[in-house]
Structure formats: structure tokens, C-alpha cells
UniProtKB/Swiss-Prot annotation:
It comes from the Archaea. InterPro entries: Nict_dMeBzImd_PRibTrfase (IPR003200), Nict_dMeBzImd_PRibTrfase_arc (IPR002805), Nict_dMeBzImd_PRibTrfase_sf (IPR036087). GO terms for molecular function: nicotinate-nucleotide-dimethylbenzimidazole phosphoribosyltransferase activity. This is UPF0284 protein PH0034. It comes from Pyrococcus horikoshii (strain ATCC 700860 / DSM 12428 / JCM 9974 / NBRC 100139 / OT-3). Belongs to the UPF0284 family.
Length: 335
């Protein structure tokens, strides 16, 4: 059987952490962050989401990075498989169900007691996908996920600062929340450095557990399409003894250039290579897109990895940026 070269997976996740006021702008309000993952997934296949009538936006109205993934796919037509890692709602499109578990608020209780079951199921899926694809590119949509990622990285002993979908990265709030979680568990930074699954169980989210399982089950090349959240996955893989030479992170330059985060340093410390999508929205006629250049949104829904697939298919980052402009114009016309 002939395998497909690359299969794009979009893993959806929710965590109660996203409802802490001020921590996530991956939704117009903290409550709406619960719907963001399913809306992102639906928008990849339809003119607009089905669960909610508009695409996810930040409180200031900046469009979801799903628009980049959709643009790249419209150009290069790669196959997409949506995976429900653990969300409040099921997306109204065909998808693989791993769990309906939502990550708990780790200040109060362990975030993911179901970690083993989720990893096991995702591993099984990864093994099956190996029969049909040479490579998988895994993106994610998980509001609040940069906080869970930073908590895991800290628990494993990395001095990491993760990015945010806002130019005002709520780093102080993130650190306060993480420290409260560490206090509950009774650890300092690095306190779980030899216990990766414990770190994931205490502070993680279902997306990270699902991506970890997929990565362990699939024996071919894996592109982790995301910013600082995929650094947490990489750190867990390394800690579990995986050889990172078959892995690569694909992200956008907005994550790499984020002065409030440590993407390059942390990737180097973990020892994983990265591809950076050189997208540029500075000449867009829409403020919602131009503001990506001011540090809004940055990455998500596998935007960097989807751009990488389009580039591999012979398109340029400029082509992707142009297509994004077109899609945004179409959206504006639908209102």
C-alpha cells in the first residue's frame, strides 16, 4: 500500500486554566475559550465554524491562526485528521475521539489523572497511522495551553518562559498560577525532572498527553507543529528516553521573535531542531492581520507546520500570506 507523504493532525484540547481571567486571549472571553478548539477545527473544513457562528478571535478581535492553516491547506491540499484529545465539546466534523477529559485547574488538584489512558489510546492511533503515512505533522488548539506547558517545563527543570497569544504576555500571572500548583504538589522548579509522566499528570492538559502518545506510537518522522507548547512535548519525549532526531518543531517567526519567551534557548536546551515559517502580514489591508506583527496571536492550529507543508509542496510563505488575506476578506464579506 502506498503511504501518504505527510498527514496533518490537529489535536484539540481544553484546560480549566484557560478560564482564569487574564491568562488566555484564545477566545473573546474566558468562557468562550471553551469553544475555541472545536471552532478552529470546523473552520478548516467550512467557510465558518458550525458550533459558533464566527471564527475564534482574541478579545480585541484578532483572527484565529486557523486561518493560516486553512490557507496553507487550500494551496497544497494536504490531508487533515482532527483528533479530540480532550475537550468540553465534540467538533461537528468527522474526528478521532481520544477522550472528553478536560485538564483540571492544577492549583486545586492534579490536572490529568487520566494521563495513562490518554497516552495509551493516542499511541495506538500513532501505530495505525504509521501504516498509512511516512510523516505526521501535529498541530494543536488548546487555550491556556502555554501555562500548562510552562508548568511542565519548570517541573522538568527548564528555565523556560512560554509565549502568549497577547503582546502583553501575562508572565507574572502564569508564574503565580504555576507556583500555586507547585505548592500544592510540594515541589520547586525541577522537582519532577526524573518523573515526566508525574509532571504531565499534575500540570498538563489532554492535548499534550495526546501528542505525546501519538509521537511515541508513530515510528516515522514527526513534526510538532506549534510553539512553546510543543517544547513541553519535546521535553517529555526526551525525559522518557526518546531519540529526538526524528522530531522537529515547526512554528512561526512570531513565536521565535517573542522577547517575553525563550523559544530558541529552550529548544536548544532540549536539543530539538526547528523550522520557522517566515510569514509576514505587515502589508495586510486588515488591522486584525497586521497586528500579528505586533505580537498578537503568533501561532496555533499548527500554523507553522501547515506553512512548512505548503513550502514543501512548492509554495512560498508569501503565497500563504496572500491566501490568508484572501480568506480574511471572504470572512469579512460573510458578516
Amino acid at each position: 500500500m502506498k503511504k501518504v507523504k505527510s498527514l496533518f493532525l490537529l489535536v484539540l484540547g481544553n484546560t480549566e486554566i484557560s478560564t482564569i481571567p487574564g491568562i488566555s486571549v484564545a477566545g473573546a472571553t474566558p468562557e468562550l475559550t471553551k469553544i475555541t478548539p472545536v471552532a478552529d477545527a470546523e473552520y478548516l473544513f467550512y467557510e465558518k465554524p458550525l458550533t459558533i457562528d464566527t471564527i475564534p478571535v482574541t478579545p480585541e478581535g484578532h483572527p484565529t491562526p486557523a486561518i493560516i492553516t486553512k490557507a496553507a491547506r487550500e494551496l497544497s491540499n494536504f490531508p487533515i485528521l482532527v483528533v479530540r484529545g480532550g475537550t468540553y465539546l465534540a467538533p461537528l466534523i468527522p474526528h478521532v475521539h481520544i477522550s472528553n477529559v478536560v485538564g483540571r485547574d492544577f492549583r486545586r488538584e492534579p490536572a490529568l489523572p487520566e494521563v495513562e489512558v490518554i497516552i495509551e489510546r493516542a499511541k495506538l492511533l500513532g501505530k495505525e497511522l504509521e501504516k498509512i503515512a511516512n510523516e505526521i505533522v501535529i498541530g494543536e488548539s488548546t487555550p491556556g495551553g502555554t501555562t500548562t506547558a510552562q508548568a511542565i517545563l519548570w517541573a522538568l527543570g527548564y528555565e523556560a518562559k512560554t509565549s502568549s497569544a497577547s503582546p502583553e504576555n501575562p508572565q507574572e500571572l502564569k508564574e503565580k498560577v504555576i507556583k500555586e500548583g507547585f505548592k500544592r504538589v510540594g515541589i520547586e522548579k525541577g522537582g519532577l525532572k526524573d518523573k515526566p509522566l508525574e509532571a504531565l499528570k499534575e500540570f498538563g492538559d489532554p492535548m499534550i498527553a495526546t501528542v505525546l502518545g501519538l509521537s511515541l506510537g508513530f515510528g516515522g518522522d514527526v513534526v510538532l507543529a506549534g510553539g512553546t507548547q510543543m517544547l513541553a512535548v519535546s521535553a517529555l519525549l526526551k525525559s522518557l528516553g526518546e531519540d529526538l532526531s526524528r522530531f522537529m518543531i515547526a512554528t512561526t517567526r512570531w513565536v521565535v521573535e517573542d522577547p517575553s519567551a525563550t523559544f530558541i534557548e529552550t529548544a536548544r536546551e532540549i536539543g530539538i531542531i526547528s523550522y520557522v515559517a517566515e510569514l509576514d502580514f505587515s502589508k495586510s489591508k486588515f488591522k486584525g492581520l497586521r497586528d500579528y506583527e505586533r505580537g498578537y496571536v503568533k501561532e496555533g492550529v499548527g500554523a507553522g507546520g501547515a506553512t512548512w507543508l505548503a513550502v514543501k509542496a512548492g509554495y512560498s510563505p508569501e503565497d500563504v500570506s496572500k491566501k490568508v488575506e484572501e480568506l480574511y476578506e471572504r470572512l469579512m464579506g460573510l458578516r
